[in-house]
Swiss-Prot record:
Recorded family membership: Belongs to the CRISP family.
GO molecular function, one term: lipid binding
InterPro entries the record matches: Allrgn_V5/Tpx1_CS (IPR018244), CAP_dom (IPR014044), CAP_sf (IPR035940), CRISP-related (IPR001283)
Listed name of the protein: Probable pathogenesis-related protein ARB_02861
Superkingdom to which the source organism belongs: Eukaryota
Example GO biological process: lipid transport
Chain spans, region Disordered: 47-152
Subcellular localization, as worded in the UniProt entry: Secreted
Length: 309
């Protein structure tokens, strides 16, 4: 800017002199050498101190950094005075006042309680618990002594299973045996609960070519059907009656008496039968399988060993 003013002043002075000295009609050319001096001033501004981002608000410095003014003359500029360093202390590593975020809150749920200690062993070992889908596979109790008559065998293979379902033992009834015999000896396979006035429940079954009432009661009517009743305990009106109806009548708590009879039929007729067979009928009083009463009369197994034949 100083150079521009000087050059302009010289040009104006030259013009005025020409007007005063030059005679009329005389052209005077005056050459002026104009020297333009350009001065470059380099100002070194210190880099600001980098302060790490923290959670505190830094205090203002006691003195702002001094920035030298731009010189107004063409003379050699004076060196800028030294810039006083900022009074903001640089935090030492590891000593920053930065407050870390609070730790996440603990979970609201309480820790799981410790497992209870195992119960002390009792004087008599408890029977093994049955798996959920089938009766226990522990050792079977001893079978009835040989030489037992038909009534004792049929009664045993009812009561051994009833005890596993909290049901009392059945008492043999000659009247129920008599009505069962009449149906069995008819050799006509099918239910009939009207004989001798009725009022009883009934299970029927047959075996082709052999006679084993123990296997019929324990294997076919109890073991095979008890598995199919899993999941129905506590249900007053379970479905799929034809899959487990023999089993539930055998262990029905409200039933107190039973009478059975097995007849040999050379040509068994009726539902799904035929040929030589042994036809077994068991009648029960009071009758079981009453709708709306299953939950109180058919209890889950207690885990006693499985009986097999």
């Amino acid at each position: 800017m100083k150079s521009s003013v000087l050059m302009t002043a010289l040009c104006v002075a030259g013009s005025l002199a020409a007007e005063q000295i030059s005679p009329p009609n005389e052209v005077v050319v005056t050459a002026k050498k104009v020297v333009v001096v350009t001065t470059t001033v380099t100002t070194t501004i210190p880099c600001p101190t980098v302060i790490p981002t923290t959670s505190y608000k830094p205090e203002p410095t006691s003195k702002p950094p001094v920035i030298p003014p731009v010189p107004t003359s063409s003379a050699e500029p004076l060196p800028p005075p030294p810039v006083e360093p900022s009074t903001i202390p640089c935090p030492e590593p590891g000593t920053s006042t930065y407050a870390p975020p609070p730790p996440p809150p603990p979970p609201t749920s309480a820790p799981a309680p410790p497992a209870p200690p195992p119960p002390p062993p009792s004087s008599a070992p408890a029977p093994p618990a049955p798996p959920p889908s089938q009766p226990s596979q522990g050792p079977a109790p001893p079978p009835p002594p040989p030489g037992k008559d038909y009534k004792e065998v049929a009664g045993y293979h009812h009561n051994v299973h009833r005890s596993n379902h909290s049901a009392p033992a059945l008492t043999w009834s000659s009247a129920l045996e008599s009505s069962a015999r009449k149906l069995a000896e008819s050799c006509n396979y099918g239910h009939d609960t009207s004989i001798d006035g009725g009022g009883y429940g009934q299970n029927i079954g047959y075996q082709s070519g052999y006679n084993n009432v123990a296997a019929l009661l324990t294997e076919q009517m109890y073991n095979e059907e008890a598995i199919l009743f899993e999941g129905n305990y506590g249900n007053n009106n379970p479905s799929n009656f034809h899959s487990w109806g023999h089993f539930t009548q055998m262990v029905w708590i409200g039933t107190t008496h039973v009478g059975c009879f097995t007849a040999h039929c050379s040509n068994l007729g009726g539902q799904g039968s035929g040929g030589d067979a042994y036809y077994t009928v068991c009648n029960y009083s009071p009758p079981g399988n009453v709708l709306g009463q299953y939950a109180e009369n058919v209890k889950p197994p207690k885990g006693q060993p499985v009986v097999t034949v």
